[in-house]
Amino acid sequence: MTDRKTLVHSHLHWRNVKRKHWQKDLVAKVVELIKVGDHDALALVARTAGIPPQLRKHVWPVLLKFHPMVVSPNIMSNTLVWDSQHQKWHYHPEIRSEDEIRDQMAHDLGKYFHKRTSAGKRAQSAASGPGAAPGGDLSPLPPGQQRVVAALQQCILKFLQKWAQFFKYESGLAWIALALAEWCPLDGGEDVLPGKRHGAPVNLYHEYFLPEEIRDQLPSESEFAFDELFERLVLVILHSPDIPKAERLARAESEMTSVLQYYPVISGGDLSFQCQLFFKVFSVILPELYQPVSDEETLRPSKKTNWMYWWFKCSGARVFHKQDRARIWDTLLGWRPHPRSLNFYLNYNSKLFDHLYSTRTSSALDSEFFHKICKYGHDAFWFPDLDSLSLGSQDLKCDFQVLSELVRRNKYDNSDDELEITPKNNGTVGSKIKKGVEIPFSLLDPHVQLIFIYMAILQQHEFKLLEFEEAEISEFFNNVPSLSRADDHNYRSLYEEEIESRSVSSSETEPEDLFKRPGSSASTPHMLIEVGDDDKASKSFDDLYNLAGDIWRKWIWRELEDNAGT
C-alpha cells in the first residue's frame, strides 16, 4: 500500500515538474510575442493556454486595444429595455443623485477590504446583489485602502459619465474594477490588489516572481491608463448584440415557417438568452444535479439566486477565485472570430476593421509551440465543418441557417453541392508572404463559451454537489472553490531557484509566503464549506477548458439530432 502511495506521489511530482517546464516556456513565448507586437498570436495564446499571471498587466491592454467588441462596442443596457411585444424601447434613466451613487460605490468597494468575522455575515455579504442598500457595520478603512477606493470610484464615474445614456451604476461595476486591479496596477506600477485575503495592495512580482532579466524585456509603460483599461474591459463583459435587429433578420430569413427561428447559440444573445441557454444545457448534461439547482425555491428571486448575476452579467466577478476568474477573462479577451465573419457576431457593426487581424501569426509563434497550445489544430469549441463555413455570408446570416447547414453536411447521405467553403490555407490578410502558423479562430460567442465553461465546473464538482443541502449549494454558487490551485502554486514558485538565491534583506519580499499554496491557513478561505482537495478538483484550468469544448459538442450534436426532422 505504501509503495503504491509513493508511486502515485512520484507520478504527480514529475507531472508537476513537466508542467512547470511548460509554464516557463509559455512565459518566454508570451514575452517574445509582446516584444514583436503580435496581438493576433497573443489572443490565440490567451484563449487556449491562458496568460501567465506575471504578464497579464502587459498583455490584457494589448488584447483590449484590438478586441472586436471594443473596436465596435454595443453593451447591454440597464436604462433601455426592449419591449418585443410592442416593438419599442422603454427608457429608465438614473434617478439617484451623484452623492447617492458615490455612497453606494464606496459601500460596494469597501466590502472587498473587510474580513468576514462570522459565517452569517459572510454568507449575507456574498449573497448581496446589485440592488443592495448602503449601510452595515463596516469599520473605517486604513488610509492606503481608502486611496484605492477613491481611485476606483473615479474610474467608475468616468465610465458612467461616458455611457450614462445606456448604463447606470450597479454593484457589478465595482467588483469588475476590483478584479481588474488584482492584475493591473492602478498607478501603472507593480502593486495590485491581493484577492480574497482582504489586505493591502501587494507587489505583483512578490506574489508571482519574475526574474529581472525577463522584466527588463517588457514595456516600461502600459498601453492605457487604468480607467481606460476598465472601460474597455466593461465593453467586453457587458457586450450584447443588437437584439431587435437580430430578431428582425431571423424573422425575414425564416418567412417560410410560422415559427421565429431566433436561436443564437453561435453568434450569442442577450443576458436573458444566456441564462435560458445555461439551464437548457444544464438539464441535458447534468440532469440529476439540475433538479436541486432548478428547484422552485432555489430559483425564486432572492439574495440566494444573485449568483446568476455575478456568473453571467459580470463574467465571474466577486464569486470566483482571483486566479480562476482571470483565466476565464483570458478567454474573453483573447476571443477573435475570423475577420470575414465579424458582422455575424457583431450584427450592429458598420465599421470596416477586418484589416486589423491576420489569419496567420508572426514567425515568433512557430509550429511546435502552436501544437502545444492547439493539440488538434483548431479552436476548443470546434464542431465538424463549422470552421469551414463563411458565417455571415448571403446564405448563412442567422444561426438557424448555420445549424441547418451543419445538419445537412453531417448526414450520411450528404451530397457534394455544399455552400461556400473557405480554404484553410488562405494566407495573411493584406499580405502575400506566408509566415508563422494559420490561426484557428473562435467559433462561439465568448459569453456562450462561458456557459459551457461553467457547465464543466459543475460537472467537475457534480458528485460533491449532489451531497450538499440547498444552503450549501447556494454557498457554492456564490463562492466557487478554487479550480486551478496547482497551476497557481506553480506560477508562484516558477522561479524558485532564483527566489532562493536572492538576498532576504528586504522585509517586503516575505519569501516564506511565496511557497504557501493558495487556500492555506495563511489566507482567508474562500469557501465556508469543504469541497475536497482531491486531484480531480485541483487539475489545470486547461483540462476544464477542454472539457467545456467536449460538453459543447455533446450538447449541440444532440440538439441537431433532435431538430434534424423539423
UniProtKB/Swiss-Prot annotation:
Residues 123-139 have a biased composition (Low complexity). The gene is OCA5. Its main location: cytoplasm. Keywords: Cytoplasm. SMART domains: TBC. It comes from Lachancea thermotolerans (strain ATCC 56472 / CBS 6340 / NRRL Y-8284) (Yeast). Disulfide bonds: none annotated. Belongs to the OCA5 family. Residues 50-336 form the Rab-GAP TBC domain. GO terms for cellular component: cytoplasm. The keyword Translocase does not apply. This is Oxidant-induced cell-cycle arrest protein 5. SUPFAM superfamilies: Ypt/Rab-GAP domain of gyp1p. It is found in: Cytoplasm. Residues 120-140, 500-522 are annotated as: Disordered. Signal peptide: none annotated. InterPro entries: Rab-GAP-TBC_dom, Rab-GAP_TBC_sf. The lineage of its organism: Eukaryota, Fungi, Dikarya, Ascomycota, Saccharomycotina.
